[in-house]
């Protein structure tokens, strides 16, 4: 995707905020528990390479990604000796590519291990489906058979075993406890404990630090975002949001009563009013459902009017502004703040989706 460096729309990523979130989490972890930075999906929209560099500087001991291509991008960017785990499914025919690049893969099916032809040792993390219902083995018999298969092949190493909690971001813990118990049953069925046992995502690491095992997978909260609104007041420390989204007015005009804007003419002025066109649209991740949401102009709220277009959006101004005036979509302006959580609430979604939708057409600028 082409990045729009010559357009006045940009994202600012506060590296100091990422470092602070990591340091605060590390301070509450036992010394023998590693923190792995989850940088999948372009680091949740924050930029995979720069976030990985920042996380490593802050003390992260490795990285988790969703697909092999993300792991290879990290290797190509210079992360040659760092631990990298692919959390998602990898094609069997790509196992050798992962092995040659010293990338750890998730395995969750016995047949995936059959007839592998490897030119280098492959490190494997066994995924346990303890109740998430996506990927993973579900019985002790499966776990033991896979352990036996791996032990017979000197090119395979059972480096880790892990699971993922479905309700760690909820205050009610009964389902979480069921998952943990099932995982521990499968873990103890193995003849040999792998090097890495890991279960905790951001929510679990924040609320249930006792189940850190050997490593935690620090994702959404590394970026300063709360895993869910339900646990926002139960966090052990304040999270610092790292992402802000800005643009500038490229056209300012005054509407007369009866003038309409954007596709479908869904908004019509009822009085004389000032409006501005912004060079950002749904092709950038500002989806059409943002219509009616408010942005900040000189610290004042300004509503998005009419339909969000592919490349442009129109806002109603509180008064006349100059072309080139800055607009804050996510971030702080003159003491007022619009957060990713605010956008998520308006869109009836979660903060993860808000930042992940912001694609690479918007340039990222890294500060601090």
Swiss-Prot record:
EC number: 5.1.1.1
Family listed: Belongs to the alanine racemase family.
Pfam families according to UniProt: Ala_racemase_C, Ala_racemase_N
SMART domains: Ala_racemase_C
An annotated GO BP: D-alanine biosynthetic process
Catalytic activity: L-alanine = D-alanine
Residue intervals passing through the bilayer: none
Enzyme class, first EC level, given as a word: isomerase
Species name: Listeria monocytogenes serotype 4b (strain CLIP80459)
GO CC annotations on file: cytosol
Gene that produces this protein: alr
GO MF, one example: alanine racemase activity
InterPro entries: Ala_racemase, Ala_racemase/Decarboxylase_C, Ala_racemase_C, Ala_racemase_N, Ala_racemase_pyridoxalP-BS, PLP-binding_barrel
Binding site for substrate: 134, 310
Pathway: Amino-acid biosynthesis; D-alanine biosynthesis; D-alanine from L-alanine: step 1/1
Residue numbers bearing the N6-(pyridoxal phosphate)lysine modification: 40
Active site annotation, chain numbering: 40 (proton acceptor), 263 (proton acceptor)
Name of the protein this chain belongs to: Alanine racemase
Top-level taxon: Bacteria
């Amino acid at each position: 995707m082409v990045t729009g460096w010559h357009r006045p729309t940009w994202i600012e990523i506060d590296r100091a905020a990422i470092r602070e979130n990591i340091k605060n989490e590390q301070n509450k972890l036992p010394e023998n528990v590693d923190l792995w930075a989850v940088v999948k999906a372009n680091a949740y929209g924050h930029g995979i390479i720069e976030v990985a560099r920042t996380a490593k500087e802050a003390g992260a001991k490795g990285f988790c990604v969703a697909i092999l291509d993300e792991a290879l991008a990290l290797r190509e960017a210079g992360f040659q000796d760092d631990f990298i785990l692919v959390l998602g499914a990898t094609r069997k025919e790509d196992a050798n590519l992962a092995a040659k690049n010293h990338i750890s893969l998730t395995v969750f099916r016995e047949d995936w291990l059959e007839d592998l032809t490897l030119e280098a040792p492959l490190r494997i993390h066994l995924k346990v489906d303890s109740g998430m219902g996506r990927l993973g083995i579900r019985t002790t018999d499966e776990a033991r058979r896979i352990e036996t298969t791996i032990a017979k092949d000197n090119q395979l190493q059972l480096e880790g075993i892990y699971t993922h909690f479905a309700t760690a971001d909820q205050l009610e813990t009964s389902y979480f406890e069921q998952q943990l118990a099932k995982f521990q049953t499968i873990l103890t069925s193995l003849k040999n404990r792998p090097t890495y046992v890991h279960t905790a995502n951001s929510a679990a690491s924040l609320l249930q630090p006792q189940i850190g095992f050997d490593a935690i997978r620090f994702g959404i909260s590394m970026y300063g975002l709360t895993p869910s609104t339900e646990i926002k007041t139960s966090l052990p420390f304040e999270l610092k949001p790292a992402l802000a989204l800005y643009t500038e007015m490229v056209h300012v005009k005054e509407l007369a009563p009866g003038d309409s804007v954007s596709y479908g003419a869904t908004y019509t002025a009822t009085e004389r009013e000032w409006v501005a066109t912004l060079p950002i649209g749904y092709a950038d991740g500002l989806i059409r459902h943002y219509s009616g949401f408010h942005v900040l102009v000189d610290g004042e709220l300004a509503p998005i009017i009419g339909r969000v277009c592919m490349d442009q959006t129109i806002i109603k101004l509180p008064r006349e502004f100059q072309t080139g005036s800055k607009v804050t979509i996510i971030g702080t302006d003159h003491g007022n703040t619009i957060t990713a959580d605010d956008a998520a609430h308006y869109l009836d979604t979660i903060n993860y989706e808000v930042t992940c939708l912001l694609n690479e057409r918007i340039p990222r600028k890294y500060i601090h």
